[in-house]
Amino acid sequence: IIVTDTGSTDRTKELASRYADKVLDFAWIDDFSAARNFCAQHASNNWILSLDCDEYVNSIDVKTMRILMQKFPRYTGVIRLKNLVLDEDGQTGYGTDDVTRFYNKNFYTFDYPIHEQVCSKDMAKREEMMQCFLLPMEVVHHGYALTPEEMQDKQRRNLSLLYKNLERNPDDSYTLFQIGQSEFILGNHEKAVTFYERGLAGDPSPEFIYVQVMIISLAKAYVKVGREKEALALMDRYAGRCRTAK
């Protein structure tokens, strides 16, 4: 177990040192991928399970994981993340996300400064779908159990990093998608439409999950700004290529 601390001011390091093999310091540079990759570099094994401090493992089948690692050495592992959320009345609920967090560091690395993604180290393969298996484990995430005010603050933080990355990569569809998501949550639906449209302008493959989400999100944003006909036209356009559009 390796814990990378990016500047905590509480007892995080003290508590982590009771359980971790290594507790490392990493100066925060507005880049979550850089912190994750720094941590992975110090691992003695090649297979990496990357978790955040607001996540915990609720259950795990290590025996099955080992079998999957041996059978599919170049695959990545997907966690079904159980997100703890608060509704408008402050009641607790759960949503789920499938996220790639298990990988062999010989072949894969994290990319993007925020909403970081496991990507192939071979740049020529970046546009290909990664092969993956579902990990036999449940991980609970507390990072979205926020009040509306806290959620808005988090989205503004996210946007500051996303816009910086967009300056470096102005046509990156994933970054454009994530900006659209944050603007939508903040209630800036016209802005969200603009960024979703830009994200789809390069015709990224709907085989990627984020593209499917972007299509549906754009349709919802169209409805929010009174452009229902365009929402229907969008669904028709992607019906044959995107299962969520059907």
Regions found by a protein language model. Give the residues of each.
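Short aromatic/hydrophobic "clamp" motif used to bind/position activated sugar donors
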Residues: 48
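Conserved donor nucleotide-binding strand/loop of the catalytic core
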Residues: 14-38, 42
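Flexible helix-coil transition and linker loops at the boundaries of alpha-helical arrays
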Residues: 165-169, 200-213, 241-246
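A conserved acidic beta->alpha catalytic loop
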Residues: 5-14, 28, 52-55
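Catalytic-site signature of metal-activated, phosphate-bearing donor transferases
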Residues: 34-40, 57-194
